[in-house]
């Protein structure tokens, strides 16, 4: 672990009187009796409810926010029951799950990584070590697969999939405090900006899907990656890629839609047949006008990188998600 004591997920008992903290502690307390439901594989990408292991995967992935809540509650209260629950859940998951390196299936592991980062000092040595090995496998596996992909990169190596890979790389590297992994991730972050974000700020996913839903789904993980590496002297929000693109420009491109100045009918000209299947199945958000409030988390994350985004974040969602309000870098 790096010598830095200012983890990228910070929270202290002094914040336990915060209304968001009280709400989170109450929720975590309700879940203290819950047991983990680890699976060796999760798979929801490209499938609909009740197909394959979709339903089981959704149920199992609910463990991740439970362990993050417990980790936050431990940091707020130092009640060892919460640390013990995180330890139990982490041990179960990292001892069972085999990474598939499908970033859409694995994107929700971000909450597991946050749980480890928050509760690391309260874990048993065995769980701490096996989780570190798991996170290293995750980071190195995603980096290695990107580097081995056929050049020039295309398809899922330049769309939202790669943004989710970058997030998992960055969060794992930061949780480990491994500066060499952070530098490798930084290189791939800039590569993704060059491949995914146009100089005007529009993204590959909007061109392909004709949906602002996918702009948000593409930018949220890149923003999370930037938050993760901030304590290591990395400032990725306005760093320019080789084509001049920046993460900030992509967020700013979305802003006229997020603030209501412009509207967009979703998926009308999507090139992906699965989008129509989801609309036909009645899944919410896959037809009709885009809902700006769905970008609330993105703008709250962006506000952690630049407070100028906060007024719009507050319009979209009155408060940040509690985990972000309590522990993201301030």
Region spans (language model):
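Extended amphipathic alpha-helical interaction segments
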Residues: 134-147, 151-165, 172-174, 179, ...
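Extracellular glycan-targeting catalytic surfaces
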Residues: 1-152, 163, 230-231, 239-330
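Alpha-helix capping and helix-loop boundary segments enriched in small/acidic/polar residues
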Residues: 103, 156-160, 213
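Long, repeat-rich segments with strong aromatic
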Residues: 175-176, 180-265
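Hydrophobic anchor position in alpha-helical repeat solenoids
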Residues: 66, 79, 169, 222-225
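A short glycine/serine-rich beta->alpha loop
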Residues: 98-99, 155, 208-209
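Amphipathic alpha-helical repeat scaffolds
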Residues: 71-72, 167, 171
